[in-house]
Amino acid sequence: MFATPNLDVYTQYAIPTWEKYCATHSYHFFHYRDAYYDDLHLVWSKIRSVREHLYEHDCDYLLMVDADTIPTSFELSIEEILSEFMTHDKQILFQKDGSNRLRYLYFPHNLKLAFRSKRWILPNAGFILMKNNDAVKAFFDEWLAHAHSSPYATQAPRNQQVLVYEMLTQTQIENMVGYVETWVVNKFKGKLCQHFSSKTPEQIAALMQPIYRELVIR
């Protein structure tokens, strides 16, 4: 997780809940707090933190979660998610940036980006489950390089626009990217975690607190 101190209002709940989830499944949890750049939006420091972690650690898999995510239970393991969605040709799994309405109808959250890019399923860079291999390292090298060169890098949603317009348009990259279904993670209540969006830090904190109390304090 990459989370700067200004997010402590809700990471005081998110971090200990993720730590307990990781402890339950014998995973390691890492928290990166410091920005890497003065001239780039913090989303690029998040991508940089993932890149650095891949190069500095010998883990087989890495899950990056945004600071505004929190586990909803400790039952679902990463191994189960990998078994379900990391098929033989996939290297990276993203959260779908959308929700299922009426159970079966999927709609992207960013309709403007979906229509412009002609992609109904868009990646959400707030939840990324990946292998730690040369192909994934090269993926993050390229993604980060666009932060300094792409006109999309400064237009929200910055890193996701770069991903959609400049990376997923490459066949070899599109083929290595997959998605977890919305029942795993979404902005309502996924089986693994909930990813809050379009809310103030105080609103996120208020929504996270009861989950934290149920899973950590009980």
List PLM regions with ranges.
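N-terminal anchoring/stem segment of glycosyltransferases
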Residues: 1-60, 170-171, 194-203
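Short coil/turn segments at secondary-structure boundaries
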Residues: 12-13, 76-77, 141-142
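Conserved beta-strand termini and adjacent loop/short-helix elements that scaffold enzyme active sites
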Residues: 32-34, 95, 179-182
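Short catalytic/ligand-binding loop motif for oxyanion handling, primarily in non-cytosolic enzymes
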Residues: 39, 71-74, 79-81, 101-104, ...
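Catalytic core and acceptor-binding pocket of nucleotide-sugar-dependent glycosyltransferases
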Residues: 48, 120-218
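Conserved donor-nucleotide/metal-binding helix-loop-beta segment in metal-dependent transferases, i.e.
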Residues: 71-120
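Short beta-strand-to-loop acidic/aromatic patch adjacent to the donor-nucleotide binding site
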Residues: 59-70
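Structural recognition of the beta-strand scaffold that forms the well-ordered cores
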Residues: 30-31, 63, 91-95, 127-129
